[in-house]
Amino acid sequence: VQPSDYTYDQFAADLDALRQQLGQERVWLMGHSEAGRHVLYYALQYPDHCAGLILLDAVSFQDERSHTDMEMRLRERQHEPWFDLAYQAFTSQEMPESEADFLKFIQTILPLYYYDVANIQLNASHHAATSMSLDAFKGSAQCQWHKTNLMSRLKEICVPTLIAVGSHDFICSPLHAHRLHMEITGSKFILIERAGHFPWYEQPDQFFTKVKEGLAAVQASTWHNLLIR
């Protein structure tokens, strides 16, 4: 199997097969980061089987505006002692050659993804428990997922949608999340203060409180809209 064989259609079909295996008619889906694009695509391809979405520091497109925003947010941290090595690794076109090199790469760029780098050590056990695959990383680059831009189709999303983002996420930023919010009718936007790309790690109390409140609000709004139709 070649990396190019893995398409959004294939991933959406796999998700739907899992839904059927679980015996569920409709499912809520949550996607973090690039997985946000996957769950959005599922909602577009299988609207009758998607009950709602949680887009968590999610991405659905890349364009010049989002790239400029990311670069600006990166440069805001250029005086940090770890920045030069992290930025060099993040922008490098060279692919790690071994699993050890891949792990070193992840550890080098990780400070960029946190609001407070002290939280990296506090969450070390979570990162250690996360499976990493160099082959999967290479495959994701070769399948050119970044060329899939769902921006023009977001108006088609018609399920309850909660959009949550860390205030200092540089790669799936508040600007990007707000653009999603403006395109998805009836969606709710929540900002997790003092958090980066992993807000549930850095601000767990704030994150879970706001997400629970946000889910209740978006579901109540959906029921209200149905009743007044």
Which positions does each model-derived feature cover?
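Active-site loop/oxyanion-hole signature of alpha/beta-hydrolase fold enzymes
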Residues: 1-34, 209
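Alpha/beta-hydrolase
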Residues: 82-152, 159
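Flexible "cap/lid" loop of the alpha/beta hydrolase fold
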Residues: 53-93
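Short beta-strand/loop motif that positions the catalytic acidic residue
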Residues: 157, 163-165
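Catalytic active-site module of serine/aspartate enzymes centered on a nucleophile-bearing elbow/loop
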Residues: 187-229
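Short alpha-helix in the alpha/beta-hydrolase fold that links the catalytic acid
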Residues: 159, 173-182
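Acidic catalytic loop of the alpha/beta-hydrolase fold
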Residues: 168-172
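Conserved hydrolase catalytic core segment
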Residues: 25-69
